[in-house]
Each structure stands twice: as C-alpha cells, then as structure tokens.
From Swiss-Prot:
It comes from Bartonella henselae (strain ATCC 49882 / DSM 28221 / CCUG 30454 / Houston 1). Residues 17-44 are annotated as: Disordered. Binds to the 23S rRNA. GO terms for cellular component: cytosolic large ribosomal subunit. Keywords: Ribonucleoprotein, Ribosomal protein, RNA-binding, rRNA-binding. GO terms for biological process: translation. Belongs to the universal ribosomal protein uL15 family. This is Large ribosomal subunit protein uL15. Residues 21-35 have a biased composition (Gly residues). One of its GO terms (molecular function) is structural constituent of ribosome. InterPro entries: Ribosomal_uL15, Ribosomal_uL15/eL18, Ribosomal_uL15/eL18_sf, Ribosomal_uL15_bac-type, Ribosomal_uL15_CS. It holds the Pfam family Ribosomal_L27A. Part of the 50S ribosomal subunit. The gene is rplO.
Length: 154
C-alpha cells in the first residue's frame, strides 16, 4: 500500500443533508421539523424544554451542594519532586514550600496549599513546608532523612 492508495473507509464520509430544497429531496417543505408547533418555528429552542414532558432536571432529585469553605490543594507526588531535583529545577538546600514548587514549574497555579503524595521515590534529604502529606509520603521522606513541617499559615 502506498500513500496515493489510501482512502477513507466505506461510509466514513457522508454528504450533509440539505433540507428544505423541494419535495423531491425527501426533506423539502417542512425540512424534517414536522407540522406546526413550537419546535417547527424558526429561532432558538428552549434549553431544558422537552415538549411538555417533565424535564430531566425536574424528574431527578436535588443532590449535594458546593462547600464554600472547601480547600483546593495542589497535589504533588514525590516522584515529580525527585525528577525536578534531578534536572536542577528544585534547590534542596532550602525547605520546599508552595512558592519553591511554583518557581520550579512543578505546579502551575498556587491554590490553597500543597498535598504531598507518595507516588514515586525520593532519594535525597530534603525538608518540606506543606499543608498535608500522606502517611506513606511522610515515611518515604523520613526514610530519606528529610523532614515534613505543617505550618499554620500555609
């Protein structure tokens, strides 16, 4: 097979249906909209209106709410931190906090804090100032000789 022999699969490309172009076309006159009624008229359709049938947003019960006080944390794995250290983006002399992670390009946007997760391995001794760290992440950091601090202001 050569590049000039390539073609689309049968039925992959279909001609668009041109409606309202004469009765011989099969979709002339009413153009597939039926006869009369709100949905046959021109203009925008009503969002959520199902032709008089009880709409889905009223058939289903209300559920849950948006917690205004919920904290949105940046989740960072130890593997990503180790790769940033290996490439020289992260300085291990200073404690790692949310600003250091932002400058290293590990997180894009500063949120309410940092959540350390244990995915990957940490090979160097390093100190962290973070909002939260999983138990497994804490154990891996302490095994490598590092420390985890949870400042009140973070």
């Amino acid at each position: 097979m050569k590049l000039n022999e390539l073609s689309d699969c049968k039925g992959a490309i279909r001609n668009r249906k041109r409606v309202g172009r004469g009765i011989g076309s099969g979709t002339g006159k009413t153009g597939g909209r039926g006869v009369k009624g709100q949905r046959s008229r021109s203009g925008v359709s009503l969002n959520g209106f199902e032709g008089g049938q009880m709409p889905i947003y009223r058939r289903l019960p209300k559920r849950g709410f948006r917690n205004f006080f919920a904290k949105d944390y940046n989740e960072v794995s130890l593997g990503r931190i180790q790769s940033a250290i290996d490439t020289g983006k992260l300085n291990i002399e200073k404690p790692v906090d949310i600003i250091a992670l932002k400058e290293a390009g590990i997180i894009r946007r500063v949120k309410d804090g940092v959540r350390l997760l244990s995915d990957g391995e940490l090979k160097v001794k390093i100190s962290f100032n973070v909002s939260y760290a999983s138990k497994a992440a804490r154990l891996k950091i302490e095994k490598a000789g590092g420390q985890v601090h949870f400042p009140e202001t973070v």
